[in-house]
Amino acid sequence: MRRVIILGSTGSIGVQALDVIRANPDRFEVVGLGAGRNRELALAQAAEFAVEHVSFGADDAEQLVRTVEADVVLNGITGSVGLGPTLAVLETEATLALANKESLIVGGALVKDRVRPGQLVPVDSEHSAIAQALRAGSSHEVRRLVLTASGGPFRGRSRDSLADVTPREALAHPTWDMGLVITTNSATLVNKGLEVIEAHLLFDVPYDRIAVTVHPQSIVHSMVEFVDGSTVAQASPPNMRLPISLGLDWPHRVAGVGEPLDWTTASTWTFEPLDTEAFPAVELAKAVGVSGGTWPAVFNAANEQAVMAFHAGRIGYLDILDTVTEVVDRHDGGEVTLAGVLGAEAWARRTADEVIAALA
């Protein structure tokens, strides 16, 4: 029986994790829940799963993971506010099932220096796919990682045609049902850029050996290319419960968590090169990742500010990446300490607001 704490229990990842646990009461026991503002749902979850320990907010989440003994903590918090809880989990003996990619991206060395071998299991579908595929060979046999992207709702459109995109259009993701910021990030492909940085940090593969290909069907979730020319991919119908279940009990699989592909029905899988002119976010993220230090934290914070300004009607769609680029260009770098990262984030948000005000 795995004792589980779920942070972000009322969000998409948390709700689906509870679906997995509900269907497998013989394998998992919920011992703690962490939520944000949705107190009503969190308390209902606590009642259903007989959970005594419930926290609200990131600070309380840190205290929760330090005081409640668990085998695995699923961090499904959205945004860089999840960094503190991530670091708190790494102080314990629990496995960290990480869906909060931002905490790894902005924390960088802060996280890597604290994590024990095998303690961190990725929950993002792409990185879960890579982790599964990497079991087919040794690390020195890996030629490159290939992350797949659906292309978002604006695949195939030119940059000029995106100038008048509305917030409603940006939230129409073709595959996944997610929150406001991450869905917008999927439209701009900032999310894929963040995933490139995450892949580098998780798997210690250089940026020049991490590629992105557009795969509109979202069946192949990512691939590992080996030195002998073979490619190992993980494929399944889109279903976040699969990587969530692996995160909860890695490396073991949970039977029945998802439906398999139907190999008796004709289907077509396509792969396309990424249009970096229309979607420059991935290349910008790679440059930010290579720079290291506090640049990823600045990139992420500036983007969060710009996305919220876009949805508030203060700037246009193309202004999101223009704002992020301007803020990144102004940054002088900084030391990767907790204070340094938090300071860089605060600076990035202030600077982004200045850029946004000039655009408005």
Locations of regions flagged by a protein language model:
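Catalytic, metal-anchored helix/loop core of enzyme active sites in primary metabolism
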Residues: 1-360
